Every structure is written in structure tokens, then in C-alpha cells.
């Protein structure tokens, strides 16, 4: 595309405006008529969203002018929308189609909003990352994607005022310069279009002619996942006006289309003023509801269905094929891989009878000796999640994890922390034990209620933190199996009770295990092994696992069956009656954890019913967490857990074991075959 001229100019302005009218009448007549529906206040601002792809197909020249000169063309578009609105209003009145008392107030504020989704403007040139915005983009229509990290208050700003020449009484409108601190500059001489000209330079402000607009400043930051290691995420201030204000909050993922401009930095003594870039928004779209930009074609969904149709006779073997795709470079650790999958998939959020929301996202903590693969699982889980934030306990404070109150230009604003930025995704915290006790207590509310209540600098609000927390920590010194988790990890009981799964990975001496693991690591580096994968697992690559997790979370809402309820209830009662129970773990939260994990396992198994098999899988995950009060002897060490040849038959044996110890339920051994 050739570089645009310095100023907007067309050969025939009337003809250009008629083309805008034709576009609106052809594609948005119904939208304009909907704006005419009864509203209590005619001073409201109404958006009219147009599709840039439709405009480009209808009139390429107008679309190019809109890209090159968005400020001028959007003003003409707003005027065209107002003309069309007045025309439809007059036509309806003449036709007398309105009922008595259905008269509407005149709508004076209609703004054309440009949606560039699915158009040519999604190319890297017109939709760069925030860190790649340059001077060449100034004045053009730009689309930026990012996360809202700061949200200011809604203010009132002057939009225009009218003056009258004292000499010829000519009236004209003056718009403030937003880039210059909303300063108004009067013309040097009268703008009269009379043949003789006026030449007057003395103007008088017309009373009650000042028009004000709602105004809000936010700041968005580019997606951390799209950056390379060592890159600093860049941010961009965004100006929202009129109907766009207060539609996003800190932590929201947004796509913003607008005009790139610049404003002078505040005057500070002995500091040189600079031009800071800013985007004057025309259209804002929240992408929180999407949670993912993953495009799952029908062919991929058919592959999922075919896979489970082929695994109908041996469903657990099919499940294990999926689990082997998680951290394939690490041998074994079946229990950990199952727990990671269930944590990422999660259960179903619901609202109880009192109106309290019960979270569906599980939390997971890995406690283990150095070299047991904890950080590897954290990084792989972050890759599998559509939205993730990775941090370490040593480099995290309570403000950095939750929210910070910052002062900008004399006004206090809230800046989102890691848990808010990970809303709807995964927050990985490595070296969890390195956090100070005060910082750890600040995330209690974020983990259980999934909100953060803020009362800082006069700002009182609540932000969403609907995120899964995945932590990793080392034990304090040598792990003592006879002591509780609180003693071994120095983590408080209230914090431990919020983790659904706490897996302990002990690097104990095991000659057979060491030989198998060393052979696996050496085989990965031989020429014969490179580039080869086993046939059952060749399907479950990283991208396929991401699509699968996203698909089952969106399309399956499992419900517990009566048999699954009895299994979970019996196990919970057995744990509460155990003489060696851990008081910090065996609370009502453990019962909720069992339900969440059972629902997650049902999703993993590609179904909408939580069966006894899912309940037993959830119990086995919890059993691996109950290091001192496990009631199933077959739980074993999570570090040495491996994939079995016949998992379906082995599950029947574990069913019998749990049934015998629970003593409340008669298990049917044909559960899997049915």
C-alpha cells in the first residue's frame, strides 16, 4: 500500500458522502432502525458497528481512505449515520407507523465503530504487536491485542464548543486537541465563507454550546506467551470515549481498533517533554468469553470421536495414550501426568442454594526433592493452557500477585498482578516455599473465592481471579514421612487445604527404577530414537493436546450419577473417621475437590456423566496426596508410578480394594466393561 498523503482530500466530497450513505443504507438499515426504538434519554451515545471486510468489498477506495485517514473519514461516517437516522425517523413519522405514546426522543449521538475482525487489517502491518508499533503507524487505523493491566476512572472531557464572530456574527465549531492536553486553539481569522470575507479575529463563546464526553484511560499489555525469553512486555495507553467507557476492567483480554496518535508527556521540572504514543479507540472487543484463539476444525473433532470409538472396549488405555503426550521427555510419573491433566481440564463451576459460587478450577501443588521434574511440569502445563502466567516465589510479592495501586497524573489507578492477568487460565508459581508468609496469605481469597477484594488509596473494588494455581516447592530439609505436610513444607494448613491435589515426589533409592529411567534418557539421545514416536501416541502432540483440553472444557458439563455420589461420600466419611487423618487436608474442601476431580476425569474420558470409574480415579489422585492417612495401599510413590500394560484390569483390583476399605458400597467389577 503506498504511503498516504499528508492531508485527507477527495475529488468530490459530496460524491464521497453519498457512497457512505449507500453503504449504511445497504448493510445497516436494520441496525439504524433499532437505534430509533424507545429510549429514555436522547443524550445517550449509540454505537453502530460496521464490518471492515464488508466495506472493503463494497467500496475499496472508501476502505483505503478509512485506513489512511481514520479521523476524517470516521467524522464523515458519523455524519452519514446521523443523516440516515434522521431519514428513517422522518419516514416512520410520515407513515404514521408508531403507536400513540411510542414517540422517541431525537438521537443526536451515533458513532460508527469499525470491526476489523476477519478482514485484511488483521495482517502484521495493520495489526502489529504493541512492541512493534512505530512512527509509520501514526494517524492510521490500527488494531492491537493485549490484556488490560490498568484501568482509570471515568471522567468528563470537553468535546467541542461554538463561537460567534463579533463582526459578521458567523458561527463555527472548535474542537479541542486531545493530543495537547485537550487545549482549545481559536483560528487566526473568521471562518466565514462569504464572498467578501470577514477577516475578524474577535470571537465570542456561545452560551450552553459546550459539548462534553465521557472519558477513560486504560493501559493494555501485550500477551506474555507470545514473547521470547528475556523480552519485556510492552504496554500502550488507550483512550476510551462515550459508549466505550467502563466496558473493560483490569485483567480482561481485549482487541482494540483505533487511531494511533501521540501526546506530550506531563511537564516536570528539569525533565524534557517527549511525545508518548497512545491509541484513541474506535472499537473495543472483549475476548474473555472466547478464552482461546484456538481454531478447532471439524476434522480434528472427528479425530477425537474416532479415537474414543476405537477405545470403547479399553477406555483407560485410551486415556493413558493421551496422558503419555504430557511431558513425553519424562519417563513414567503416571500419577503426576494424570493430576496435571485433571487440573488443566477442571470441573464445572456451579452456584449453590445460597447463591454462593463454588469454583470449578482445581489447584495443584508439587512437593518434591530437587531433580524430580517439578519445573518441567509447570512449564509444560503453561504451554497447554490457553492463558498462563509463570512466576517464582522469590520474585513475587503480594502486590505483584494480586493488584497494585499506582498514581498516574494525580489519579490513583489499579494495575493487575499475576493472578488477575491469569484470569480464565493458569498461574504457575515455582519455588512456592520462597514466598514470604505475608505474601502467601494474600492469595487465600484468590484461590477459594476466585476474587480479590481491594481497598487501596480510596479504591474499593473486587477483581476476578478465576484461575488455576499450579505451585511447586521443595521440602524443608529431608522429608519426614511421619510428619504432616505443614511441617515438611512450612506451608500453613489453610493454604494447603485450598490445594485439591498435593503430590509428594520423593527421590528414594530404587535400583530397578534408576535403571529404567537412565535407559530412557540415554535412548532419547541415540540416533535410532530421534525422530521416532510410537504409533498410539503419535496423535497427541502439544497442539493436539491444547485443542483437546479446550474442546472438552467447552463442550462437556458432567453431572454426578448416584453411584459416583455414593463412592465419593463413602470415601470422605472414611477419611474423616481415620485416626491418622491430616486435619488440614480432610475438610469439606476435600469433598469438593473429589467432585471437581471426578468431573475433570469424566471430561478427560469424553463424556457428560460422572461414573464410579471417574470417582475412583479422583480418589486415587487424592490418595497420592494423603501421605500420612492414605487408606489404599496401592497408591504408592507418585515419583515411581508408571503406565501399566492393562490399566482397565488393574482398575478393577483397585475398585475392590477401595470397596473393602470403605465398607459402605458393593462395587460392581463390570463397571469398565459397561
Swiss-Prot record:
Record key words, sorted: ATP-binding, DNA damage, DNA repair, DNA-binding, Helicase, Hydrolase, Meiosis, Metal-binding, Nucleotide-binding, Nucleus, Zinc, Zinc-finger
Residues passing through the membrane, by range: none
ZnF (C4-type) intervals: 165-198
Binding site for ATP: 368-375
GO MF terms held by the record: ATP binding; ATP hydrolysis activity; helicase activity; single-stranded DNA binding; zinc ion binding
Function: Probable DNA helicase that may play a role in DNA repair during meiosis.
Family membership: Belongs to the MCM family.
Protein name: Probable DNA helicase MCM9
